[in-house]
């Protein structure tokens, strides 16, 4: 079961919801996010939100495939959705900036 904290509720008229928070440890409880398949699993219900906050609390390592799929591929395919890392380590934030993350 994936825990999702929705900051704001759906607006009338089918508009995009405001913010969806994804807690990585809840989605990937036994592994660090390393693969593109992990990224697709994390973001599978992300469409329809203006912003996705990814909470890295308790995550010690992030693989390049995961980072690239989330912070480059997904954001290029969905430029209307902002991806925000939360509780990411300094090295993870540097990786996001270095490998193409435009939205942090």
Which residues does each PLM region occupy?
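Flexible, glycine-/charge-rich segments associated with ATP-binding catalytic modules
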Residues: 1-37
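Amphipathic alpha-helical interaction surfaces in cytosolic regulatory modules
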Residues: 26-103
């Amino acid at each position: 079961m994936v825990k999702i904290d929705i900051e704001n509720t759906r607006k009338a008229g089918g508009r995009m919801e405001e913010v969806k928070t994804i807690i990585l440890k809840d989605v990937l409880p036994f592994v660090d996010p390393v693969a593109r398949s992990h990224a697709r699993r994390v973001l599978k219900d992300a469409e329809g939100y203006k912003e996705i906050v990814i909470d890295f609390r308790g995550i010690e390592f992030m693989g390049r495939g995961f980072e690239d799929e989330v912070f480059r591929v997904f954001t290029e395919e969905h430029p209307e959705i902002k991806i925000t890392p939360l509780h990411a380590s300094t090295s993870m934030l540097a990786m996001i900036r270095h490998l193409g993350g435009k939205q942090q």
